[in-house]
Amino acid sequence: MKIDGTPYRSIWVDDADRWSVRIIDQTKLPWAIEIPRLTTPEQIAHAISAMLVRGAPLIGATAAYGVALAMRADPSDEALETVVPMLAATRPTAINLRWALMRMQRALSAHPPAERADAAYAEAAAICDEDVATNRAIGEHGLGLIRARAQGRRRVNILTHCNAGWIATVDWGTALAPIYMAHDAGIDVHVLVDETRPRNQGFSLTAWELGKHGVPHTVIVDNAGGHFMQRGEVDMVIVGTDRVTRAGDVANKIGTYLKALAARDNGVPFYVALPSSTIDWTIADGLGSIPIEERAPAEVTTITGRALDGSMLTVRIVPKDSTAANPAFDVTPARLVSGLITERGICAANERALAAMFPDQALQTAA
């Protein structure tokens, strides 16, 4: 996608040296665009855990390049066996992280150490290219849903939660890809953007993305979604996800479950957009089996923004003697999901439908 007319991916190998890794620091958006240069797997791990990069597909791609940097420094078996668990420990909920690392480990184990650095960069690049193609396909399938809702309507109002746009993937995004394509196709779409406390990915990332693309949007507070649904001002909900079980349960940013409940109560279709790499075929019960990341209380008790004089300011918004809990994700049961938008099409959120859509993956896991 483009920033002020310049095309970007969210991660790439530096053109100057052809080995270091460049990312867009998402903690600085929307106020500044900073592109740090990462040269070690430790820097990659920090970028993931501190959320300089976030979004399930992107952290998988970033971790893949972390392995490549490690193999450039030391291609031994010991180094490979050390870097994979180190990177895997950075974020526990998103399955794409583990998927990408396991793919890298399998690919590199087939090469002698002397070939591993080149092979690692090639595999990481392939993961990135495949992500772009996958998200484009997700967008095309989701576009059909939006086009169908647009029949006989002046405008299609879509609510989204958190950020599942191009900055959360290598390009295009998952939940936002159909919206971009609908806008580009001339469909009158308008997006209600949840602020998404406590890290505010809605108003700091999704609103920024949509604005750069020219998509009409309105930022709303997290608790307003149900109100707009009751008033008939939401035609559909599209969100992303960090992990989907084989039975269709969905782990996504905290607050997603409440949106799904409100959508069900008001007859609003609730869709989840995802690449197949986000499906965890090893578990069925999302609530009982998906690990939920607990992040620092400071993300809840403080907030950062731009002061009127242009300076950046972090302030405490919670009384100093109050504690804060900060689960980063919740689980939406499959029964509340109208459909899963994948790169192969749209399917119901249940084990039979997922296995029919991805028989190769389901059989491979069963074996």
From Swiss-Prot:
The keyword Isomerase applies. The record marks C162 as: Transition state stabilizer. The active site is at D242 (proton donor). The keyword Amino-acid biosynthesis applies. Substrate binds at R54, G55, A56, R91, Q201, N252, K253. One of its GO terms (molecular function) is S-methyl-5-thioribose-1-phosphate isomerase activity. Its EC number is 5.3.1.23. It comes from the Bacteria. It is an enzyme of class 5 (isomerase). Pathway: Amino-acid biosynthesis; L-methionine biosynthesis via salvage pathway; L-methionine from S-methyl-5-thio-alpha-D-ribose 1-phosphate: step 1/6. It catalyses: 5-(methylsulfanyl)-alpha-D-ribose 1-phosphate = 5-(methylsulfanyl)-D-ribulose 1-phosphate. Keywords: Amino-acid biosynthesis, Isomerase, Methionine biosynthesis. One of its GO terms (biological process) is L-methionine salvage from methylthioadenosine. Belongs to the eIF-2B alpha/beta/delta subunits family. MtnA subfamily. HAMAP family: Salvage_MtnA. Catalyzes the interconversion of methylthioribose-1-phosphate (MTR-1-P) into methylthioribulose-1-phosphate (MTRu-1-P). This is Methylthioribose-1-phosphate isomerase.
